[in-house]
From Swiss-Prot:
Origin organism lineage: Eukaryota, Metazoa, Spiralia, Lophotrochozoa, Mollusca
Miscellaneous field: The Cys-26-Pro-27 bond is in cis conformation.
Main location class: secreted
Protein name, as recorded: Defensin Cg-Defm
Function description: Antibacterial peptide mostly active against Gram-positive bacteria (M.lysodeikticus, S.aureus, and the marine bacteria, B.stationis, and M.maritypicum). It acts by selectively inhibiting peptidoglycan biosynthesis through complex formation with the cell wall precursor lipid II (1:1 molar ratio) thus inhibiting cell wall synthesis. It does not disrupt cell membranes. Is noticeably more potent than Cg-Defh1. It shows no or limited activities against Gram-negative bacteria and filamentous fungi.
Signal peptide: 1-22
Length: 65
């Protein structure tokens, strides 16, 4: 039961994060990722270490929850 609850929480946390799933410069060009996120009304973007810097993750996106 504990494993199920932990897995459910992990999935909910992943779904609730504002992420752009395509590369958008990652890996190697974090500035391109940041510019992409700003272009879609997010505050900033970075190449996510949890995905070995392959995914651009946007933060503080307006109107997306």
């Amino acid at each position: 039961m504990k494993v199920f609850v932990l897995l459910t929480l992990a999935v909910l946390l992943m779904v609730s994060a504002d992420m752009a799933f395509a590369g958008f410069g990652c890996p190697g060009n974090q500035l391109k990722c940041n510019n992409h996120c700003k272009s879609i009304s997010c505050r900033a973007g970075y190449c996510d270490a949890a995905t070995l810097w392959l995914r651009c993750t946007c933060t503080d996106c307006n109107g997306k929850k």
